[in-house]
Amino acid sequence: MNFISIIIPTFNEEKYITKCLENWFNQDYPKENYEILIFDGKSTDKTLDVIKELQKKHNFENIKIYTNEKRKQVYAFNEGIKNANGDFFIIFGAHAYPEQDFLKNNIETYQRIKKEEPKLAGVGGIINKISENMSAEIAKVIYSTPLSGGSSFWYAKEGFFSNTVVYGMYDTKMIKESEILFDTDFITGQDFEFNLHLIKEGFKLYTNPNIVSSYYTRSSVKKFIKQTISYGAAKGLMIRKGYFNILWLFPFGFLFMLLSIIITGLLIFIYIMAILIDTIRLLIKTREPLYIALPILLFLFHCLISYGFFKGLIKGNSTFK
């Protein structure tokens, strides 16, 4: 049976790490066949104490704790790959937790797809968004639509070859032989860039919606605004590095439409209609009243991510410094 390494960066995660690790300890996959590598960025809360207590409580031996001296997640990811003993490694987050069949479904998916696609380097699934307050609920609403420019792992219903995977499981040997690591210029969006780099080098990725994890969305307006601007900046930096995806341009299109209003109102009409149609679709699907506000929320979201995009495009990696 395949051995799997799970790489989890942490920094002041005492609120979320218990749910994360307990779900990892209770996988329907043999405990002796996976390890958990924690890379802690010098937490100042009780994160490390909680981890050690959980390890003792569950009698889980295959857990190792490292200090992430540079603190940022991107460095933890690269160190995790170097220290991974598994046939596969998984990049995960302490702000999330996997379903009980997460490991089993990853392995089964990889083995099945690998038979038809020998260049398969990794697989991933979808994310359920958990909202703890109204700010987090607003973030959930925004990411529920493709018009946010977000990745399909938020809403995919069927399996498909994708250009990125969330909390992906990768073939350790293929990645190490390719010498592809996470680009440390990216403090945000580093996983997206890593996946695009794999695609650029001819590898394949696959998303299976049966591989499920849950993620706590940003719990404050300030954190969400900062994250959104950072995501935009990351995409601007990706274009500077030679990557491109047409979906990235949708959030920024409204800026050009505002400039074109004197010439024609057609583009603005298309923009508004696209948002209204998707608002109606989501209202019918979810029956949640908050989706009525989606047009306004998307407009504000597009403003923020556009600002970040042009900041990243102009300033490059200095945006994150």
UniProtKB/Swiss-Prot annotation:
Entry-linked SUPFAM superfamilies: Nucleotide-diphospho-sugar transferases
Annotated knockout phenotype: Cells lacking this gene result in flagellins and S-layer proteins with significantly reduced apparent molecular masses, loss of flagellar assembly and absence of glycan attachment.
A Gene Ontology cellular-component term: plasma membrane
Catalysis performed (reactions): an archaeal dolichyl N-acetyl-alpha-D-glucosaminyl phosphate + UDP-2,3-diacetamido-2,3-dideoxy-alpha-D-glucuronate = an archaeal dolichyl 3-O-(2,3-diacetamido-2,3-dideoxy- beta-D-glucuronosyl)-N-acetyl- alpha-D-glucosaminyl phosphate + UDP + H(+)
Record field: transmembrane: 252-272, 290-310
Enzyme Commission (EC) number: 2.4.1.335
Pathway: Cell surface structure biogenesis; S-layer biogenesis; Protein modification; protein glycosylation
Major localization class: membrane
One Gene Ontology biological process: N-glycan processing
Subcellular localization, as worded in the UniProt entry: Cell membrane
Topological relation to the membrane, as annotated: Multi-pass membrane protein
Classification via Pfam families: Glycos_transf_2
Keyword entries, A-Z: Cell membrane, Glycosyltransferase, Membrane, Transferase, Transmembrane, Transmembrane helix
GO molecular function, one term: hexosyltransferase activity
Enzyme class label: transferase
InterPro entries: Glyco_trans_2-like, Nucleotide-diphossugar_trans
Family (UniProt): Belongs to the glycosyltransferase 2 family.
Role of this protein: Involved in the assembly of an N-linked disaccharide that decorates the S-layer glycoprotein and flagellins. AglC catalyzes the transfer of 2,3-diacetamido-2,3-dideoxy-alpha-D-glucuronic acid (Glc-2,3-diNAcA) from uridine 5'-diphospho 2,3-diacetamido-2,3-dideoxy-alpha-D-glucuronic acid (UDP-Glc-2,3-diNAcA) to the AglK product Dol-P-GlcNAc to yield Dol-P-GlcNAc-Glc-2,3-diNAcA. AglC is specific for the monophosphate-linked Dol-P-GlcNAc.
Protein name per UniProt: Dolichyl N-acetyl-alpha-D-glucosaminyl phosphate 3-beta-D-2,3-diacetamido-2,3-dideoxy-beta-D-glucuronosyltransferase
